[in-house]
Amino acid sequence: MYRRLASGLYQTSQRRIAQVQPKSVFVPETIVTTLPNGFRVATENTGGSTATIGVFIDAGSRYENEKNNGTAHFLEHMAFKGTPRRTRMGLELEVENIGAHLNAYTSRESTTYYAKCFTEKLDQSVDILSDILLNSSLATKDIEAERGVIIREMEEVAQNFQEVVFDILHADVFKGNPLSYTILGPIELIQTINKNDLQGYINTHYRSGRMVLAAAGGVNHDAIVKMAEKYFGELKHGDSSTEFVPATYSPCEVRGDIPDLPMLYGAMVVEGVSWTHEDNLALMVANTLMGEYDRMRGFGVNAPTRLAEKLSQDAGIEVFQSFNTCYKETGLVGTYFVAAPESIDNLIDSVLQQWVWLANNIDEAAVDRAKRSLHTNLLLMLDGSTPVCEDIGRQLLCYGRRIPTPELHARIESITVQQLRDVCRRVFLEGQVSAAVVGKTQYWPVNEEIHGRLIRMQ
């Protein structure tokens, strides 16, 4: 699925949580320490001889502006090109010699750099992460070389219609806000980004109050804290709200007309909620009830939902996948699809009927099945030190803490049928539909028609 999508959790009232006794699920404790400069260290000792350790930064494309969009992603490319202490070749050789693996990725709200290594090489790995993050050489020749690499990456993204759909959707539904920016940035800015732009972004956003050092695997918390003090202890705190501009959802209908495409690629959405909104877990249950289907891969890891079973009978529908994307103050919830033009009406009507069913007719048996599936999926996502490390870092940035598994289980179990119906009614039936489609777009109806269909179904 779209690599920049994310699910979220929410904070319910203690009254609701108290009604449910958490089931016993053994998971190691996540320990968190905050250094005097605001830099947070979070670890989970899952055992073993290897570990994953990463730096998670509250800085992504939404913290950019119309003059430097693409800088966060450009920095991701530059991080591995050398520092005053380590040449590019020396860095690559050092990482290889200790048997480590370095990686990085950028999203709209955050940037992550992490290393997978043997436990005895954790200190050296943190040294490397700190060095490439804070002391990158940003040599002109390397900037020019990576400029070409990024432009080629942009050309590849332009051929990935799934990426295109979500980029044009964000561009219109959050128009006028940095959340609308693409992660790679426009080509005209990529061609002009220079060392001053890159260094300025580091100085502004790579601050201790906006960073988390997370580790999972065979790790000792006190030892990791000492590493953080050694390599990040002198980092300035910074302002956690720097250049954050709250986004407003604006209903849109955006079309990328490509007449030669045999299929229509698109997303139909309504406004979702933020990471911390009290309705988010209910929407995650609803998302599970919507389901997914891919003609090449089947129904995914879960049993097919009623919507998936219905759409699988239509030979013109290649892919549909529900999603719940969360940001700090808003979100998008809906369905991504790949379908033949003659199947579009069936697809739209089937999704709308499912929305109405969720809001008006969902029963306890279906909700219970969805909650069990959600429990299982969330636990399966944490198989290995790398996904655990990523989950720790993400939750620290989103919630300020790691939500314990028993607490999360209790929150999911506390969702009632009526609560789910109420949330789905507010979000799906009372929300305003937006759509982004690529292909033979004349086969996609206008938003007013879709809204009219939804009204008639109720």
From Swiss-Prot:
FT transit peptide: 1-41
Active site, UniProt feature: E76 (proton acceptor)
Assembly and interaction partners: Heterodimer of mppa-1 (alpha) and mppb-1 (beta) subunits, forming the mitochondrial processing protease (MPP) in which mppa-1 is involved in substrate recognition and binding and mppb-1 is the catalytic subunit.
InterPro entries on file: Metalloenz_LuxS/M16, MPP/UQCRC_Complex, Pept_M16_N, Pept_M16_Zn_BS, Peptidase_M16_C
Subcellular location: Mitochondrion matrix
Example GO BP: proteolysis
Positions of Zn(2+) binding: H73, H77, E153
Primary site of residence: mitochondrion
Free-text remark on how the cofactor is bound: Binds 1 zinc ion per subunit.
Summary of the knockout phenotype: RNAi-mediated knockdown causes 54 percent embryonic lethality. Embryonic lethality is further increased in simultaneous RNAi-mediated knockdown of mmpa-1 and mmpb-1 or ucr-1 and mppb-1.
Keywords attached to this entry: Hydrolase, Metal-binding, Metalloprotease, Mitochondrion, Protease, Transit peptide, Zinc
Catalytic reactions on record: Release of N-terminal transit peptides from precursor proteins imported into the mitochondrion, typically with Arg in position P2
Protein's name according to its UniProt entry: Mitochondrial-processing peptidase subunit beta
UniProt site positions, description: Required for the specific determination of the substrate cleavage site: E163, D167
Function: Catalytic subunit of the essential mitochondrial processing protease (MPP), which cleaves the mitochondrial sequence off newly imported precursors proteins. Preferentially, cleaves after an arginine at position P2.
Cofactor: Zn(2+)
GO-annotated cellular components: mitochondrial processing peptidase complex; mitochondrion
Family: Belongs to the peptidase M16 family.
Endoplasmic reticulum in keyword set: no
Gene Ontology terms for molecular function: metal ion binding; metalloendopeptidase activity
Keyword match Zinc: yes
EC number(s) from the headed UniProt entry: 3.4.24.64
Activity regulation text: Binding to mppa-1 is required for catalytic activity. Inhibited by metal chelator ethylenediaminetetraacetic acid (EDTA).
